A protein has these predicted regions:
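TM-lumen/periplasm interface segments of multi-pass membrane proteins
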Residues: 1-106, 125
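Membrane-interface alpha helices of multi-pass inner-membrane proteins
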Residues: 153-172
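Alpha-helical transmembrane segments of multi-pass membrane proteins
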Residues: 87, 134-144, 168
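Short acidic/glycine- and proline-prone juxtamembrane loop motifs at membrane-interface regions
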Residues: 127-133
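Residue-level signature of the transmembrane alpha-helical core
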Residues: 83, 115-118, 142-143, 157-161
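Residue-level recognition of pore/gate-forming positions within transmembrane alpha-helices
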Residues: 82-86, 133, 163
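Transmembrane and membrane-interface helices of multi-pass
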Residues: 103, 107-123
Length: 172
């Protein structure tokens, strides 16, 4: 499990550094962040994404939260974003695996390996594109564990951060 995550993060980071901005949707957020701070219309961006040309589509908070990456060199920003998202997700998988192990047969390593085996192939495309879905899925996994343990404030903070990044978290 952990070796597969390490390899995935390493490969995705190398690709992001070698081919910054290629097959990336995260640049839409960074452009919006720069436009926000320049008092420009961030919904008027026409950055090319995997889906074609479209402007920024999300809550303004996600652009503001993207600010630290918006001013880094593109390759560095792409690499940091992907490594951060995948790390948050892998850690979330580990926390969920530990929770499942408490209530079933097998240790957390087994459940983490199984989740990794099933999850990594389905998330590789999003990781390569710099999708925010990676980090919000990780935030939801962390929130799930915190909800189980009745850590209400921490779960609420994680879910609020997820909603700020992408409104899809509202479903959770």
């Amino acid at each position: 499990g952990i070796i597969a995550w390490g390899i995935l993060i390493l490969v995705v980071v190398i690709v992001a550094l070698v081919r910054p901005g290629k097959r990336s949707v995260s640049t839409v957020y960074w452009t919006a962040a720069q436009q926000w701070w320049a008092s420009q219309d961030m919904y008027g961006s026409k950055e090319l994404t995997q889906a074609g040309y479209h402007g920024f589509l999300y809550f303004p908070q996600s652009a503001v939260l993207s600010t630290p990456l918006a001013y880094l060199p593109l390759g560095v920003a792409e690499a940091v974003w992907r490594a951060l998202g995948l790390s948050v997700l892998a850690w979330g998988f580990w926390r969920v695996a530990k929770l499942v192990a408490l209530h079933s047969r097998g240790g957390p390593g087994l459940w983490f390996a199984l989740a990794s085996f099933l999850g990594i192939p389905t998330l590789t495309g999003s990781a390569q594109n710099g999708q925010f879905n990676i980090i919000i899925t990780g935030l939801m996994a962390h929130a799930l564990v915190d909800l189980f343990y009745r850590r209400w404030w921490r779960a609420a903070l994680l879910l609020a951060l997820g909603i700020a990044l992408k409104p899809h978290v509202l479903v959770f």
